[in-house]
Each structure stands twice: as C-alpha cells, then as structure tokens.
Amino acid sequence: MNKNFTLLVSFILTFFISETSTAQSWEVYNTQLQLQSRLIYDEIDLLSETVRIGKRGNELSLLSNDFKPAVSLVGTEIYQYLEPWILVKGPNGIGAFHEYGQQVLPLEYEKIQTYFNMLLASKGNEYWLFQRGFNKTTYLGELDEAKITNTGLIIIRKGDEYSMPLSTNPDKTFELLSDNDGEFVLAKEPSGFGLINREGDYVLDPIIETLQHTHGNFYYGFNQDQYLLIEGNDIQSNIRYNSFHKITFENDIMLEYIHGKLRRVMEDDGILLDDVGMTKVEKVGKDLYNVYFRDEKVGLLGKKGWLVQPMLEVEEIKNGSEGLFPASSNGAFGFVNSAGTWVIPAQYAETTLFSENFAAYRNTHNWGVINSSGEQVANASWEEIKPFQKGLAIAKANGKYFLLNTFGTTLNTEGFDDIYRTTDGFFMVERSGKSGLLDSEAKEVIPTEFEGLRRERKDFVIVQKDGLTGVINETGEIIIPVAYEKILVDWANDKIFTKNSFTPTVIQIIEEPSKKNKRGA
C-alpha cells in the first residue's frame, strides 16, 4: 500500500475519532429487558408518549417511531414543551414547532405564549400571532400588552385602549378587557360593564355600573340601585340574585345587610345562610366560614350548610375530618363534633386533623399523639408528626426521622435524615446523603447506599451509585447493572433507554513491508 495513502487514512481516522470521541451510545430494550436497538445520541428526551427528542452535538432532532432523526429542530435545546407545541431555543431566541414536525415560528423571539391552535410571540413590545387553522403568522404591531385568554381570545392593549384583533370587529376599542379563571372576559365600555364569550360576542350587554369576577363563571355587580349576582352563559348570562339591600364582597366573603344589620351569608349565585343575630363572618378555608352571633355562639358553615352547629365557649372552629373538628377555647385547642359538643376538651396549644382515628397535638414546643377518645398514645416528645396512613406516621426528633406506629412505638431505632412516603405505602429514606427504601412495615428492602433512588413502579427502582445508574428490584436483585450514565423509561411504549459513553474503535491501517524470498543457505 502507498505510504502517502496510509498517512492520509491515518489522519482522517484520527480526525474522525477526535470529533466523535464524546458521542453517547443508547441501548433500547423492551420492558422484558430484550435488546431492541442501539442509538448514537448525546441526549434523548421523552416529552410525551409520541414526542421524542434526540441531540447529537449541536443538532437537535424530532425522532421518528424507530428513533431516527425525522425533523431538525434547528435550535440547541428544548425550551419548553406545551402540548402540542415544542418551544426550541437557539442562539438568537425562541421558536416553535408543532409536535408533528412543522416549524411555525423561527428561533428569534423573546417570549411565546401558547394555546392549542395558536401562538403569541413577542420581541420587546412587538407582537406576532400564529394561527394554525390558517397556517400563517400575523404581525400585530407595537403594543403595551397582549395575551391569550384561557378561552383562546386575543386581548391587546395600546395605551388605555383594549381590543380583540380576532373578533368580528377587530377595530372596536374598550376601556377594559380582563381575563379570569372563568370562561368569560370582563369588558368595559363608556356605557358600563359586560361579559364576552369565547367567540368574542356579548352575553351580558355592557350596561352594568360595576362588575367584578368572584369564582368560576360568577360575577358580582351593582346597577340601578341593585346588587346583582350574575352567572355567565355562552348565549345569555343570567342574573341569579338581585337585591336593593347592600351586598358586600371583601376578602372573598360575600355578605348581605338588611337595614344596616348583617343578615345573610351569600354564595356565588344566591343565599348560603339567612339568619338573624349574626355579628361577623370569617373565612377559614375554601367555602368554609366561622359565623359569629350576638349570643356569643360560633358555628362552622360549609357549602351545604352547618358543618358544626353554633355553640358556646368556642372562639374558632377549623375544618375537620372523621367527624371531629379542631376548635379553640380560651386560647387552647380541642375537638368538637358536628352537633357543637366538646368531644376532647380544649387543652392543647395546637392540633392536626384526625387520620385513621389518630391526631397529633402540641404542648408548648413538642408534639404527641392522641386517639379519637382523647387518650394519649405518644408523649409530646416529637418535633413534628405527620398524619397516620396505613397505620404509620412519620415523626421527627432531634433532627432525625422515624416511623411511628399506632402504639406510639418507633419501628426504626436509628433515625433517618428524611423519610418520604410513596403512593403505595413504601418509604424512601435518606441518611448522610444516601438513599434507600423501606417496605410498608418499615423493613429495609434496599440499603441506604445510593446517591439517588426513584421507584418507577413495583420491583423497578432506578438507582444511582458512584455516578452511575442502574435498576434493582425490591429484594435487592439487579435488573439492569449499575453501569450506565442515565436510564429513561417509557412505559406507554414498552421501552427502556440506557445511556453509556463509548470510545470509537481506533482503526489503524499499516502497510506491511514487502517480503522477499531468501535464497537457501
């Protein structure tokens, strides 16, 4: 072989090896651990059951079902995935692809808002709108503000004027267009306030003097000396309640006063409680109110009526569980029932809710446990006690965590730095920066010796040790050796991805010297 050719091949191979020496090898298995294929990518991201991203060097690709590059995503990293939109970041900004592969916005924007059939992009105070139905991008101009509402309307503001560029009357201006968590936009014109549906049409004409959103599709207003409770509707909004008596809406509490006296607790579309003698109402939770009366009684009111009947000798009643409600008297807490009777006298500085017939209580600084009869189960010697589930509670003492049973006995003699409960009753534990796993009876199934541990499902635990990743089951048996950089699992498609570094094989082509026959001696 020619010597110059040999040198040229060696140079090319050396260059190729130096360029690819950082490549990553991925092996794809099914969930029965049968090898399906091998892939060469630096990174693989599973964004959804059907959207997979591969990165090789500076090239980012949307992958096909067989994990081959199908569409180049142009950018260098995935900025965000908001189904069905893939936002991609590049040197000059953010752009967008549809998950089917179509690039719809170049990578040059600062911000992109998404909706299932449109995108709103901006650079500084300039805005562009992409509409998938028309497959086009429209320049909206220089604006002070623009947004997509949760119903898909576009609201823009320029100075003090608002408009809806996608409505049937895009040039119409408003004094206010306000989005909320309901399905209707609150609009204001010189004639008053109204409500606009997702098509951009009025379902409540703009004639209301004042109007504000309360919850969902409900609104509180005032017009022509009447207080109004209004429910939005796609065709025509309905006035659910109206009154010439004063209705206030402050701190998420709606009250009606008759002749200056508190008479009714209101809900979004009508009367929740009509009673005489009320002096004040305080909100203590979602749709929960403490109602105070002139005769010094206090009751707990819920969405469907009294949760705790008004009772004496109580200052506050909290939401409860298992038929018992934490309540305070003279600064101490105990428990009352729904009839307004003390079941456990007020004697604690603080209590938790009952769970599986047990609750935690605090005296001064430390916590203990009582049962639903008020009997002490565990002394107040704990810094923290979490609710009982399946007969066990997580408790903290001297900065360490323990598992506590319903007899007040700890199941682990040596404390952990932290304990996390899994959804099916197992416990992830940490000690000295290492993780392990306990079963539902607090028995060790995986020793506390891993830097990371994630229980994907029963008998499939992804672990990290010494910078490498593997999979073990709950008996400690190795399923996938702890020898990989990363492991990804796609249960929906029956795939397991393992990542490993590799160094390409160096191929040397050496020209052997020509052999000459020697003459015999």
Feature map (PLM): residue ranges:
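Residue-level detector of conserved, function-critical positions
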Residues: 24-521
